Amino acid sequence: MLKHEYVVKQKITLGGGLDMVGRIYHVGLTVSDLDKSIAFYRDILGLKFQGEILMVGEATDKIFCKENCKARVAYLNASENIQAPPAELIQFIDNEIRKIEPDLFATSISELCFYTNDIDLVYEDLIKNNVECLSEPQYFDFSSDGFGKSRAFYFKDPDGIVLEMMQPL
């Protein structure tokens, strides 16, 4: 159970009182090889495969701003809870993927963070599976700021996407 408590200070609503923004629905990651990425997130990280879809057609072209766009999309989640957002893995078909070097200091999504209750065991397992870890688990104490204590480390998926593992203490 997470020990952190976050408070929404302002709720954004539309004219009819409808919530404009709700919970995070999923986190999308563009990958070069969907099958390889599914294997990593499922077999190494232990996420549950929820399914795969093929996106094609006019709506797909419009949402991705690309003509004749096709994408294989898979969903994996570590939780059965509908409130927990899944990882959405996207492999574009017949379109060249530009691979960029992840940079924690560039404006972008810096990392996708996963929760664990045994960070040392996860770290050892990732090392055994030849996963590139950017450091060993590190200790953080943000108690005075209201966020508590934790241990965390960054690591990379098969495409070099930076991920984080965190254990609240």
Stretches with model-predicted labels:
Residues 9-19:
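Short, Lys/Arg-enriched N-terminal segments with co-localized hydrophobic residues
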